[in-house]
Amino acid sequence: MIKVEYKHTEIAVKKKLGQNFLTDRNITRKIVTESETNPDDTILEIGPGFGALTREISTITPRFTVVEKDPKLASFIRNEYPELTVIEGDFLTVDLKKIAGEKPLRVLGNIPYAITSPILFKLLENRHILLSATLMMQHEVALRITAKPRTKDYGILAVQMQAFCETKYLFRVGRKVFRPQPGVDSAVISMKPKVNDPVSDREGFSRFVRCAFHQRRKTLQNNLKKTYELDRVESSVLKQRAEELSIDEFFRLFEQIRPLMVSSADPES
């Protein structure tokens, strides 16, 4: 069992919570700077741990909200930062609209590797109350989120995130600045929701994207033919693979075939 102690508080590291604590203050300063946080923002920090990032945010504004699942760490943060609102629980079940109130949220966090995708999709679902999110995560996932067409990392995650948010890879973080040290490097990205939703049916678009990438090396024609009536679509784009399409091309194709879904089709099959 790995234990970490800080300011007379010791915890047994829980792998299922993805607990790797950042120790380099230069990096926390850089994260806060990149987030463009200002004193008037409604700020939410995901998983403060021992408060490395919390400390930097509090130099800008002493009052904000943090969500911490580990009871011992939640207690530690309450004692160290009495002006904060500490929500002890799972971020995935938290009501973000209640936290935001009348102002959009600026979210920061060193998020657990194991639940990175659920966190990202929760933020995506709540994008209308999101000002920005500046997040540290596994380096490989950061590359997948910010990937460009015709690259090996460009896939479902890139298209779904970039369709509704401006995403940016900010900087890499080596594994040696964490306790305990993870087996991979991390990276920090930013995501800012687009002003207007490019498609009205996000769930339908999501199904379409998953179907388009179902077998990565196959053409769109082959991946989509069981789900949509493609004989009614005149588009040379169907001869391409999903990884070759830009986000705008995904939008245009979706608008063409959206009404043509086969009623009995299962997009995941």
From Swiss-Prot:
Top-rank taxon, per record: Bacteria
Binding of S-adenosyl-L-methionine, residues: N20, L22, G47, E68, D90, N110
Keyword Acetylation: no
Compartments, record wording: Cytoplasm
InterPro entries in the record: KsgA/Erm, rRNA_Ade_diMease-like_C, rRNA_Ade_Mease_Trfase_CS, rRNA_Ade_methylase_Trfase_N, rRNA_adenine_dimethylase, SAM-dependent_MTases_sf
Described purpose of this protein according to its UniProt entry: Specifically dimethylates two adjacent adenosines (A1518 and A1519) in the loop of a conserved hairpin near the 3'-end of 16S rRNA in the 30S particle. May play a critical role in biogenesis of 30S subunits.
Family annotation (SUPFAM superfamilies): S-adenosyl-L-methionine-dependent methyltransferases (SSF53335)
Classification via PROSITE patterns: RRNA_A_DIMETH (PS01131), SAM_RNA_A_N6_MT (PS51689)
Organism name: Chlorobium phaeobacteroides (strain DSM 266 / SMG 266 / 2430)
One Pfam family it belongs to: RrnaAD
Keywords: Cytoplasm, Methyltransferase, RNA-binding, rRNA processing, S-adenosyl-L-methionine, Transferase
Record protein name field: Ribosomal RNA small subunit methyltransferase A
Reactions performed catalytically: adenosine(1518)/adenosine(1519) in 16S rRNA + 4 S-adenosyl-L-methionine = N(6)-dimethyladenosine(1518)/N(6)-dimethyladenosine(1519) in 16S rRNA + 4 S-adenosyl-L-homocysteine + 4 H(+)
An MF annotation (GO) of this entry: 16S rRNA (adenine(1518)-N(6)/adenine(1519)-N(6))-dimethyltransferase activity
Similarity section: Belongs to the class I-like SAM-binding methyltransferase superfamily. rRNA adenine N(6)-methyltransferase family. RsmA subfamily.
EC number: 2.1.1.182
Lineage: Bacteria, Pseudomonadati, Chlorobiota, Chlorobiia, Chlorobiales
